[in-house]
Amino acid sequence: MIKTYQYRSILNSRNVGIRFLKTLSPSPHSKDPNSKSIFDIGTKLIVNPPPQMADNQYVTHPLFPHPKYSDEDCEAVHFVHREPKTIGDKIADRGVKFCRASFDFVTGYKKPKDVNGMLKSWEGTRYEMTEEKWLTRCIFLESVAGVPGMVAAFIRHLHSLRLLKRDKAWIETLLDEAYNERMHLLTFIKIGNPSWFTRFIIYMGQGVFANLFFLVYLIKPRYCHRFVGYLEEEAVSTYTHLIKDIDSKRLPKFDDVNLPEISWLYWTDLNEKSTFRDLIQRIRADESKHREVNHTLANLEQKKDRNPFALKVEDVPKEQQPDEYSLKTPHPEGWNREQMRL
């Protein structure tokens, strides 16, 4: 009898603990609007941004004007993976995969086996993606993606000052990348309002990632650019999944979203009638370009070679000189050094 009583007490204690944990952290795929938690990582969707969110008094002309992308070029963007060849490549690739797997587990996301093909439905499971979960994922991704370009540009800026010489146009492209990623984030936060816990994760993530990236870039900048190249591959994969979900009518709330003014002021080929899908297409196209740029920079001699995307050389054929803005590239996985005339 004593053993039976003890066993029941343990079961009751376990049930109480489980109910308490569910209160703190409801199921990631729960659609109950009243399901709240102090650890909620959901993002509230803003269909019609109120006028006070416009921030028009702070808007300036873009420091790096965005090129115009055609719908056809944006549709043609697809997931491409650069196979790791060196030990540094493998470390960078596995590092990105580890970070992504950890974030996927926390947010209840599962990567489709074929991001370019038909998606498997995970309705009714923790992997079902809702509009709120997608916004959380996009906001966190862009808060991280804006760090590497600025950190790398800062280090190269100091390097140029210290050695009293030019940096051969690396800084401009890196600053452009950081600015572009920040515009992605500024646009998303007009569409979604993240929870305080999501903001806390962003604060902590930026503090750790920015300092770690800074230290590694001082020692091995090539590894850092390769890491960012693989990170951008995952960004293209994520946005491709999002577009597929929109096309499959799994995210009906996004059909009613009115794009904020900041979006068409930056992407000049958008307007007030553009859809959320149009915006995601442009953002995915940007990420694909960052993928090409960083994989290419990782293939260069870090202290000797010019940045071929920004510093052009006359009389060099187009097939041997990357274009900084064109999406029609023969090497979306990055240019090898021998494919360019430096």
Swiss-Prot record:
Entry annotated with the keyword Mitochondrion: yes
Binding site for Fe cation 2: 181, 232, 287, 290
One BP annotation, GO: alternative respiration
GO cellular component, one term: mitochondrial inner membrane
Entry keyword annotation includes Transmembrane: yes
Compositionally skewed regions (Basic and acidic residues) per UniProt: 308-321, 330-342
Location within or outside the cell: Mitochondrion inner membrane
Pfam families the record matches: AOX
Transit peptide residues according to the UniProt entry: 1-20
Subunit structure: Homodimer; disulfide-linked.
Alphabetized PANTHER family for the sequence: ALTERNATIVE OXIDASE (PTHR31803:SF3)
Biological function: Catalyzes cyanide-resistant oxygen consumption. May increase respiration when the cytochrome respiratory pathway is restricted, or in response to low temperatures.
Listed name of the protein: Alternative oxidase, mitochondrial
Organism this protein belongs to: Wickerhamomyces anomalus
